[in-house]
Structure formats: C-alpha cells, structure tokens
Amino acid sequence: MLWGFDLVVEPAAIEVHTAVGRTHVAMAGVLLHARSLVDTEVRDLGGHRPIRVMTPVATVLDCAASRPLHEAVAVADSAMRLGAVTLDQLTEAVQARRGLPGVRRLRRILALVDLACGSVLESLLRVLLAQHEIAQGRSQYVIRTAGGQIVARADFAWPDVWLMLECDGQRWRDPEDARGRDRRRDNEAAGLVGGSCGSPGTTW
C-alpha cells in the first residue's frame, strides 16, 4: 500500500480511482474504480509531474468501506500506529459523511480501533473478541514490580480476573525463542501476584 499501512491480505492488484465518465484502458494488475473524489480526499505526490493520490484519511475510509470488518480495523489501527492519521481525523471524516450509505459501518469500525494496538494480529483478535461479545481487555497492559521494573507487557489483560492474553504469529517470531521468553515472563508475572497468572496464547 502507498502509505505503508499493514495489511491482513496483500492486494492482488493496484487499485486506482478514475473520474466518473472518464475513458480508460484496461491494464493487467490494475483494478479501476469509477469515483469522483473531492479535493480534501486527494493530494499531489511526486516531483515536477506529480500524481494525485488519496490522502491517508481517505485511504483508511476507502478500505473501511470495501474490506471485511477485521481487515478494515487492522488498516485503521496501522494508520494510527504509524502516525499517518489520528482518531480525531477519522472521526471528523466519518461525521462529515452523516446520512450517506455505509456510515454506520464506518462508525462500527471506529468503535473497534485501538490507539495502543501493536500489531495486525492484535487487531484481528480484538475484532474476534468483539464479535463473540467478550469484554474488551486492556491493551498493552504492563506488569511491574514493587520497584517499578517492567516484568511483562501483555497484548490484552483483564486484571480483575488475573488473565493475560497473547497473540503471536509464527511468521513473526522464532517459536523456540518465543516459548522460552513467554515462560519466563509468565513465571515472573505469577510470582508478583503470589499465585498463578493465566496467559493463554492465540495464533493464526
């Protein structure tokens, strides 16, 4: 993707918007959409012969309108993680579409995004928890010693029931190193609370 947002599924083609009624030539690997964009949705990119591209905010909303829910949330989380957009910018853009088709879906996506999200897998798991009506845990929860030293940082945590939840993908981490590190972390966290601390793991 142009702006470097993390994706759940890599696109099979480059998607290009063209003005409604404009003629175009079909090209392999390019998917054309007929849609007229307003000036606030585009910006010029490049040197002496710039091309017009969708802004980061418009890109996030375009993905939100066309991708499955979990993919849309992952894109929005990634855009915020990279600092390309803010939640306020997305909220303002959605409010500007009040009364238009698809705005309820956009609001649903905004309700699921998380400024603290650290990865695509965390986005996917958060959506899955919401779809199964499981109370959302606290993201990137930090456990410290009495002296303030960080012992563990959980992807999700429910402190009131002493539960941490990690989501890891084998494509991102070496399994052996990950298991050893996770065991040490869980043991240290359990020691701090004087008993057992549940830390189930999920993967894709």
Where are these regions (language model features)?
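Short gly/ser-rich loop at a beta-strand->alpha-helix junction or flexible surface loop bordering the NTP-binding
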Residues: 1-104, 138
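Surface segments flanking catalytic/ligand-binding clefts of nucleic-acid enzymes
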Residues: 80-204
